[in-house]
Amino acid sequence: MNAHPQLLHARTALYPRDRRSVAVARDLTRVTFADWGLTRRSDDVLLCVSELATNALLHGVPPGRCFRLDLSLDTAGVLRVEVQDSGPGEIRTPDVMPESERGRGLLLVAALSDDWGVRHREPGKVVWCEFRGCRPS
C-alpha cells in the first residue's frame, strides 16, 4: 500500500491582468467544487482564491502578463490552491491599522486555510494554501 496520497483531480487556468479575472477565477473554483463533488469548506476556499488572485493582480502581475490558478485534490482529501505570478516582490503579512479596508488578504488566508506559504520561482512566486477534509461526497 502506498502511504503517500495520490493526485485525484487537477485544474489549471491562466488569467489576464484585469480586475474581472478575480471573479472569473472564483467562478472556476465554484464549478470545480461541483465537478469534483466537493461541498465542505467551499466558502473558505472561494474567499482564499479571491484574496490570492487579488494580491497577484495588485502586486504580482506586470502589464501584459497573466497569473495562473492551480487547483488540486489528492486522495487524502487535501485541496491545494496555488496562484502563480511573474512579478517581483516579497510576500508579507502587513501590520494593518484597525480602520484600514486593505491589507488583510494574507491574514484571512492564514486564518481560513490549514496551511499556506510562498515558493519563489523565476520569474515571480507561487502563493499556496491547503484545506484538509475536502473529500468528494
How should these model regions be labeled?
Residues 44-62:
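Histidine-centered phosphotransfer motif of kinases
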Residues 1-12, 57-137:
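Conserved beta-strand-loop-beta-strand hairpin that lines the nucleotide-binding pocket
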Residues 23-50:
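Conserved short strand/loop->alpha-helix "switch" segment adjacent to the catalytic nucleotide/phosphoryl-transfer site
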Residues 15, 31, 54-55:
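Preference for short coil/turn "hinge" residues that link or interrupt alpha-helices
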Residues 12-24:
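STAS-typified acidic loop motif
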